[in-house]
Amino acid sequence: MDSNTVSSFQDILMRMSKMQLGSSSEDLNGMITQFESLRLYRDSLGEAVMRMGDLHSLQNRNGKWREQLSQKFEEIRWLIEEVRHRLKITENSFEQITFMQALQLLLEVEQEIRTFSFQLI
């Protein structure tokens, strides 16, 4: 993972944690938690791809990795829809910018995970 992506994740997570969205703050905290979990998963897939032969240890360690991968794609789709919804309802420009950047980053991460998974298949 390149340093720009790391800083993008850190920047968006920091800005999202500063937002006050009233009654939906629990939902936002859940989004932040899922975002962080997604980043860690993407990083671990990327590391597995970097180490040739890790495919076999990944498959041995986790016989259900395809199922796990499918679940992560569902999480990404949910987060994308949630971010799009937040983007539509917010009128605060700081929040709009943050959610637009989060959406762009989610789409990039989805593509990276797809690329990693194709290399692992």
From Swiss-Prot:
Location comes to: Virion; Host nucleus
Keywords per UniProt: Host nucleus, Host-virus interaction, Transport, Virion
Residue span of motif Nuclear export signal: 12-21, 85-94
Give one GO biological process term. Answer: exit of virus from host cell nucleus through nuclear pore
An example GO CC term for this entry is: virion component
- Which SUPFAM superfamilies would you find in this protein's record? Nonstructural protein ns2, Nep, M1-binding domain
Q: Could you tell me what this protein does?
A: Mediates the nuclear export of encapsidated genomic RNAs (ribonucleoproteins, RNPs). Acts as an adapter between viral RNPs complexes and the nuclear export machinery of the cell. Possesses no intrinsic RNA-binding activity, but includes a C-terminal M1-binding domain. This domain is believed to allow recognition of RNPs bound to the protein M1.
How does the annotation summarize its subunit structure?
Interacts with protein M1. May interact with host nucleoporin RAB/HRB and exportin XPO1/CRM1.
- Family per similarity comment: Belongs to the influenza viruses NEP family.
The name under which this protein is listed is Nuclear export protein
The organism that produces this protein has a lineage beginning with: Viruses, Riboviria, Orthornavirae, Negarnaviricota, Polyploviricotina
